[in-house]
Every structure is written in C-alpha cells, then in structure tokens.
Amino acid sequence: MTKQHSFEREELLQCSQGELFGPGNAQLPAPNMLMLDRVVRICEEGGHYGKGELIAELDIHPDLWFFDCHFPGDPVMPGCLGLDAMWQLVGFHLGWLGHPGRGRALGCGEVKFSGQILPDANKVTYHIHMKRVITRRLILGIADGTVSVDGREIYQANDLRVGLFTSTANF
C-alpha cells in the first residue's frame, strides 16, 4: 500500500479523533489546540538529515481564538503554540510511519524566537527535519524545526522530542 504524502484539514480532524492511525495510536489535538490546517508534504526521507521531512501550514485570520486573549490591544500568536505545532508534527510523523502508541512531547533543546505572528499575517509554515527515530520499548522521534510567517523564518527549535506510549499510566 502506498503511503499518503499530504493531508487536508478534514483528515487532520480525523486524526484528532483517533481515526487516522487507529485506536490508541498517535492523535493530533482537536481544535482549538490543533495548530495545523494541512500537511503539504510528509516523507520518510529528505530533510536536512535524510531521515524524513514534514511541511505543514496554518492559515492566519484575525478571529483565531488566541488573538482575543494574548494580548488585549496587542494581539500576537503565543510562541508556545508554534512550538506545540512542531511537537504535533513530530508525533504525527511517528504515527504516519506506523508506530503504535499515544504521543507525548518530551522536550527540546534550544528554542529561538526572532519574530511574531500577528492577525494581519496570511500563513504560517512549519518545517520539520527528522533527525532520528528510535524504536525500542519507547518510540522516540527527534527533529529540528522552524516556523515561518509569510515566508519569513521566525522560530527555530532543535532536538524536538516526542515519544509514543502504549500506556501512559506511569508517565
């Protein structure tokens, strides 16, 4: 069977309900925490390290929920939501590869913010470069990622780590 290499919003919503990779396996969060509108490219090879690559997008419009509360009179998308989107994509990649378990963000190395996402922006692009997938008792994905707004790179994160757990009881 040929793997799908792009996903539209409806398919990402199916993933948030546990319907894309099967029960008990990787899920994306549901709206409002789903920070993606589409995955335009996902592959097992490619990226900076030749271990896989994802490119995803979020359409920006002024009525997104976070602009009302962060901050009143000075609306900006919280940087932590861009970071979370990168973790979401690393977990999505692990599920897409067919690995079992529920995803949990496990940390990252250095994160740099050099810009902001404002309500008048058009599109956010996430670019994930998989560095390693460890498949032992724990499935662990490690990646570097960037966030760009309207073509300008504004966040960088290295060593994004996401694990897949078949049981989260002792997590």
Curated annotation (Swiss-Prot):
It comes from the Bacteria. This is 3-hydroxydecanoyl-[acyl-carrier-protein] dehydratase. Its EC number is 4.2.1.59, 5.3.3.14. InterPro entries: FabA, FabA_FabZ, HotDog_dom_sf. It catalyses: a (3R)-hydroxyacyl-[ACP] = a (2E)-enoyl-[ACP] + H2O; (3R)-hydroxydecanoyl-[ACP] = (2E)-decenoyl-[ACP] + H2O; (2E)-decenoyl-[ACP] = (3Z)-decenoyl-[ACP]. The keyword Nucleotide-binding does not apply. Transmembrane segments: none annotated. One of its GO terms (cellular component) is cytoplasm. The active site is at 70. Gene3D superfamilies: Hotdog Thioesterase. Its main location: cytoplasm.
